[in-house]
Amino acid sequence: MMQAQQFAHLVLEWYPRFGRKTLPWQWDKTPYQVWLSEVMLQQTQVATVIPYFQRFMLRLPDIGALAAAPLDEVLHLWTGLGYYARARNLHKAAQTVVERHQGEFPTSFDEILALPGIGRSTAGAILSLSLGQHFSILDGNVKRVLARCYAVEGWPGKKEVESHLWQISEDVTPAKGVGQFNQAMMDLGAMVCTRSKPKCELCPLNTGCMAYANHSWARYPGKKPQQTLPEKTAHFLLMQNGSQVWLEQRPPVGLWGGLYCFPQFAEAEDLNHWLQQQGIKSSGLQQLTAFRHTFSHFHLDIVPMWLDEVFPRGCMDDSAGLWYNLAQPPSVGLAAPVERLLHQLAKQ
């Protein structure tokens, strides 16, 4: 088993030659930029994040701007990244920093950990990467490197497995160069010790990696227990009036919280009944091509029902909704399936 000191030495020796140093959030490593990038990178690939990060920073360059921005704008900038609770928590945390810390990002681990949406690893990344403070991290990439190198059995989502990995992470994190070490660990996981087809021959840790020695990299980290995802159906009502389409804002919590979506119904009968209640004729209702959208915990089969020449009336004057202009789209957050359907309507 590789000793902690040797592990850290090999990682720090590898980074200057092969690590990533030109990512947009590495140009100016402020706590705000590191925080934003770390949150965006959760469950999302670097290549996907880069343009979102750049657009976000252009519009909301600091924590004060983020706190002052309407949530709709934050969600709009996030549209397409998914896991929208991340955006809502960013906004909430920025407002907390302004209210409780006079707009200065806290530099205490406990104060950062108390902010909405920030866990132990993200807090450690913020402090180590931007300020050089001695904190370990354990994101998905780091879990994979450690699980393979030390042959840690079990799925990292299990508390005891995660605790074991945290202990190893703390043991191997060096006293000096912690920011560079943590960045190197994330880079190793992303570039070398990848989920499939890892480049073991290029890894600085291969001389002491237990998975490499036993030709068992595919075994680590352990897989999440297989679960059959339940299936649900939703009928989306696409009401169009010229270049405008009616959207309703979802409640602030729950699925697609705070985003704008089409009116949604579990059954076609419910949709027709709602139209009848609003005094809207359903004779021109057309079904568009259905498609599936998969969440982490269920499949949603979406059946789009399109109705043209619907004029504003009744509930459609409600402040909880808006007529979305396809020609001049407003800056609001959209669920991915909604954005897809709006693009489809705009092309018609």
Locations of regions flagged by a protein language model:
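Intrinsically disordered, low-complexity, charged terminal extensions of DNA damage-control enzymes
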Residues: M1-T22, Q26-W27, A190-Q348
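Catalytic cores of DNA base-excision repair glycosylases
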Residues: Q3-E201, L205-A218, E231, I280
